[in-house]
Swiss-Prot record:
It comes from Polynucleobacter asymbioticus (strain DSM 18221 / CIP 109841 / QLW-P1DMWA-1) (Polynucleobacter necessarius subsp. asymbioticus). ATP binds at S238, G239, G240, V241, D242, S243, S244. Homodimer. This is GMP synthase [glutamine-hydrolyzing]. GO terms for cellular component: cytosol. Pathway: Purine metabolism; GMP biosynthesis; GMP from XMP (L-Gln route): step 1/1. The gene is guaA.
Length: 535
């Protein structure tokens, strides 16, 4: 049995990052709603290998009546507890401290970079710092996002960290092994966040670092076999990383009981349909049915400009096609999807009490209530880096596993506004040029291609025209935007600082080789505030 960390979710959009950081430390973690049954929590800790509990952040205020609280049993089981942001505030409130809102303190909400001074030598922070002051105080560079603040420590707690604007930025009761931070150690902006979480799970909770993808394969295969039995499964194959790894994992578990349905909706990357068939049907021996549905999708999307409406239409059409194909497969009872954690968090999916919806994902947002197929989502609890690690462990080729993510709705969410076949054709060719040049351009320092140095890169079609000059003539043609980001987890991302020579070459090639486009721009927005995809 794996040692485990229980994460109680109070509705933060980055709760999954906590789980990712714990798993980075090779410790298994599970996320459950903050108001789950206390008996479940007791069994998780006492019978299922639970070694510690983390309380997440959230959008509520503990100063308001009826705001969420941690089940009291959390503080009675004798295991370490770590509170983060709202988790710190509810811990303080429930254990006898005090919390006040920014408004009542006459302060503004604190959001962004901050430098925190560590106090004393707690077991959690001892020796962890980014730099020290001339007085010898250890300083941490962290990310804050809060309105309320703890104003009085609970009995038996001591001050662990502070800033000028947040005098109690961390607290600790070392006898009970209760710790809490106002800042977010789970986000990459907190430089020592990984070290803090590793210290908590390894040295405070004494968890064994035994969570590896090889173990996950064995467990997932067993679970899939028990779940599916002798029934048939169909999987929507896109050729992207997630659906590819899901197909390989399910095929490992049930072999020919899996049939992949590859829907060519006319919104794929250039020549992608043929490449997908070559990779799966011929190289991996997986049963694949190719469905040419371009005209159907284009018809459904005619006149639709709203991005949420497009996603819902594309998702619904996918499901209907799968249902139709399942009728041709004897005993088909399951629809498999490559849904992963970021899909769920961006959809404010199951378990996200109080979370705010950002955008829906086609895997979780467009499923009809009367769907005749049961859902099989073997990657639902994994982050992108874990999915890639799993793909390698399954023996998939590197070019498949490390291919950049591609959205389920395809170019439907990379063509702003209404989707037209003309726009799709222009975008396919522009995007292919961008990716080709990224693969062919090697960074002198790392000796890696810029494709490998970026986490996701693509072109976006803008349904606006601009004036240009080609030869002696005036042109009035469309604009494409190039987007390239670098990220560790896809929850936050930085725009990639591509070489100007590379961008210039891509722009020249697109304008000269793709008739209908006369202007190329580069997106330099981070996430947040922007999302990675434009729609």
């Amino acid at each position: 049995m794996h040692d485990k960390i229980l994460i109680l979710d109070f509705g933060s959009q980055v709760t999954q990052l906590i789980a990712r950081r714990v798993r980075d430390a090779r410790v298994y973690s599970e996320i459950h709603p903050y108001d789950c049954d206390p008996e479940f929590i007791r069994k998780f800790i006492q019978e299922q290998g639970g070694k510690g509990i983390i309380l997440s952040g959230g959008p509520n205020s503990v100063t308001e009546d009826g705001s969420p609280r941690a089940p009291q049993i959390v503080f009675e089981l004798g295991v370490p507890v770590l509170g983060i942001c709202y988790g710190m505030q509810t811990m303080a409130t429930q254990l006898g401290g005090a919390v006040a809102s920014a408004e009542s303190l006459g302060k503004a909400r604190e959001f962004g970079y901050s430098e925190v001074r560590a106090h004393g030598h707690t077991n959690l922070l001892k020796g962890i710092q980014d730099f020290s002051t001339s007085e010898g105080h250890g300083i941490l560079k962290v990310w804050m996002s809060h309105g309320d603040s703890v104003t009085a420590l609970p009995p038996a707690f001591k001050l662990m960290a502070s800033t000028e604007s947040c005098p109690i930025a961390g607290m600790a009761d070392e006898d009970r092994r209760f710790y809490a931070f106002q800042f977010h150690p789970e986000v990459t902006h907190t430089i020592q966040g990984t070290a803090i979480i590793e210290r908590f799970v390894h040295e405070i909770c004494h968890c064994k670092p035994d969570w590896v993808m090889g173990d996950y394969i064995a467990e997932a295969v067993e679970h899939i076999r028990k779940q599916v039995g002798d029934e048939e499964v169909i999987l929507g194959l896109s050729g992207g990383v997630d659906s590819s790894v899901a197909a390989a994992l399910i095929h490992r578990a049930i072999g020919d009981q899996l049939t992949c349905v590859f829907v060519d909706h006319g919104l794929l990357r250039l020549n992608e349909g043929d490449m997908v068939m070559e990779m799966f049907a011929r190289n991996l021996g997986v049963k694949v049915i190719r469905v040419d549905a371009a005209s159907t999708f284009m018809g459904k999307l005619t006149g639709v400009a709203d991005p949420e409406a497009k996603r819902k239409i594309i998702g619904k059409e996918f499901v209907e096609i799968f249902q139709s194909e399942s009728g041709k497969i004897e005993n088909a009872k399951w629809l498999a999807q490559g849904t992963i954690y970021p899909d769920v968090i961006e959809s404010a999916g199951k378990g996200k009490k109080g979370a705010h919806t950002i955008k829906s994902h086609h895997n979780v947002g467009g499923l009809p209530e009367d769907m005749h197929l049961k859902l099989l989502e073997p990657l639902r609890e994994l982050f992108k880096d874990e999915v890639r690690e799993l793909g390698v462990a399954l023996g998939l080729p590197r070019e498949m596993v490390y291919r950049h993510p591609f959205p389920g709705p395809g170019l439907g969410v990379r063509i702003l506004g209404e989707v037209k076949a003309e726009f799709a054709s222009l975008l396919q060719r522009a995007d292919a040029i961008f990716i080709e040049e990224l693969r062919n351009t090697i960074d002198e320092v790392s000796q890696k291609s810029w494709y490998d140095l970026t986490s996701q890169a693509f072109a976006v079609f803008l349904p606006v025209k601009s004036v240009g000059v080609m030869g002696d003539g005036r042109t009035y043609e469309y604009v494409v935007a190039l987007r390239a980001v670098q990220t560790q987890d896809f929850m936050t991302a930085h725009w990639a600082h591509l070489p100007h020579e590379l961008l210039g070459k891509v722009s020249n090639r697109i304008i000269n080789e793709v008739r209908g486009i006369n202007r190329v721009v580069y997106d330099i927005s981070g996430k947040p505030p922007a999302t990675i995809e434009w729609e």
